[in-house]
Regions:
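Flexible coil segments in periplasmic/lumen-exposed cytochrome c-class electron-transfer proteins
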Residues: 86, 97-151
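Gly/Gly-Pro-rich "capping" loops immediately C-terminal to redox-active cysteine motifs
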Residues: 29, 45-81
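N-terminal secretory signal peptides that target proteins for export/translocation
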Residues: 1-4
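Bacterial N-terminal signal peptides
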Residues: 6-16
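Electrostatic cytochrome c docking/interface patches
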Residues: 15-31, 43-46
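Internal catalytic or translocation cores that form aromatic/hydrophobic pockets or channels
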Residues: 80-90, 94-95
């Protein structure tokens, strides 16, 4: 009888196990399209009407600072993306590869899954106020980033 119960449990769990194993891994580009392009657009330009900042001439500088890297892990699109930390690192690196160029030409350091996990665990109670800190830090370095119209 115990063997029959064990087999029943295994058979009941089999469809869920197969479904989880069958889920395809999406490319960072595909995850960008599915999770980010709705607001930032296919060209990473954001929208003035939607108060979404553009990536070009900004995201590489933001990712070049400690504050900026933490900020990037707390923007609403990342927080609500349902991506795991590895996928978030991959999408962020895709964004940096496509739009992260700075005047120096030096690429931003790629995100790792461990870094994403660590930075997402850091408390950022007000992401708008935190972005202001990032922008102020960059301004002190002589870098202006995309406008951010939030109050």
């Amino acid at each position: 009888m115990p063997l029959l119960r064990s087999l029943s449990v295994l058979i009941a769990l089999l469809p869920a196990t197969l479904a989880a194993a069958d889920q395809p891994t999406r490319s960072p580009h595909t995850n960008y399209i599915l999770r980010c392009a709705g607001c930032h657009g296919f060209e990473g330009l954001g929208t003035t009407e939607g108060d979404i900042p553009a990536f070009p001439d900004s995201v590489g500088y933001i990712a070049g600072t400690d504050l900026g890297r933490t900020y990037m892990m707390h923007v609403p699109g990342v927080v609500g993306s349902s991506l795991n930390d590895r996928e978030i690192a991959e999408v962020m690196n895709y964004v940096l590869d496509v739009w992260g160029e700075t005047e120096s030409g030096a690429p931003a350091v790629p995100f790792t899954e461990d870094e994403v996990t660590r930075r997402r665990a850091e408390p950022v109670p007000d992401v708008v106020a935190y972005r202001r800190l990032v922008v102020d830090e960059l301004a002190e370095m002589g870098v202006k980033v995309a406008d951010y119209p939030w109050p």
